[in-house]
């Protein structure tokens, strides 16, 4: 079981989210976010740095606007799941309240009654290395996010991640869309979840004690 902060607007959501460690923060803490280091994150959490507003970036707006249609497609393609969606609710670990997150949806598998998480990602494929990040795996920063959500509550037994990959063909001037689904089982990653929890406990200590953590260079 875990605690839920029930919120119905974006302003309150941003306020409560900033007080803890969210899903997108996990990769920064482990040095797996190519765009932000753990030190950048610490400076934001301690008020030394204003987080960059990325809400008006085209890729961010696309991902936000695409989420609901992709969620509805998932519901059509996977009728074996009950899908629950609360856009602003913040889910918090019962004992470690700073470990928190807002899910793209919660799932219940009808046959087994197991609880899970649904996560949605959109990504542009611009070069061959971008394909490799999605080949039989998910990118490291998204994997850290899934582990973080597993850390919120051990009752979440799986995560279904839906990825829509967009590729521009310069020769034909056409867009190709590739949809991938990944099923991640909690029990397959127990050591990774425990490791992440310990690292987030350490990072939270640096925040609470206003101590600068050692820099972890992001993996590019």
Question: Residue ranges of each PLM-predicted region?
Answer:
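Short, mixed charged/polar active-site loops
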Residues: 98-100, 113-117, 176-181
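Metal-dependent nuclease catalytic regions and adjoining charged, substrate-binding loops involved
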Residues: 130-143, 148-220
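A structural signal for short, well-ordered beta-strand segments and their strand-loop junctions
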Residues: 82-85, 117-119, 158-163
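A short acidic/basic microdomain associated with nuclease active sites
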Residues: 75-97, 104
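Amphipathic alpha-helical segments that form well-ordered structural scaffolds
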Residues: 69-77, 148, 152
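Charged, glycine-rich intrinsically disordered N-terminal tails and low-complexity linkers that flank
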Residues: 1-65, 69
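Conserved catalytic cores of phosphodiester-cleaving nucleases, focusing on short active-site segments
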Residues: 74, 103-130, 149
């Amino acid at each position: 079981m875990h605690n839920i902060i029930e919120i119905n607007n974006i302003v309150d959501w941003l306020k409560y989210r900033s007080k803890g460690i969210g899903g997108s923060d996990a990769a920064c803490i482990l040095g797996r976010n190519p765009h932000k280091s753990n030190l950048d994150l610490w400076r934001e959490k301690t008020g030394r740095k204003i987080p960059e507003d990325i809400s008006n970036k085209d890729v961010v707006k696309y991902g936000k606007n695409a989420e609901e249609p992709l969620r509805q497609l998932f519901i059509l393609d996977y009728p074996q799941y009950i899908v629950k969606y609360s856009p602003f609710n913040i889910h918090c670990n019962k004992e470690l309240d700073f470990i928190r997150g807002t899910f793209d949806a919660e799932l219940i598998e009808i046959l087994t009654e197991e609880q899970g998480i649904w996560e949605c990602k959109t990504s542009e494929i611009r070069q061959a290395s971008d394909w490799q990040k999605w080949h039989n795996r998910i990118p490291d920063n998204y994997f850290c996010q899934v582990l973080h959500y597993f850390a919120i509550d051990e009752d979440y037994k799986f995560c279904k991640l839906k990825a829509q990959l967009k590729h521009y063909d310069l020769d034909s001037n056409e867009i190709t869309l590739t949809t991938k689904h990944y099923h991640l089982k909690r029990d397959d990653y127990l050591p990774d979840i425990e490791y992440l929890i310990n690292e987030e406990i350490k990072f939270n200590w640096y925040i609470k004690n206003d101590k600068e953590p050692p820099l972890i260079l992001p993996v590019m």
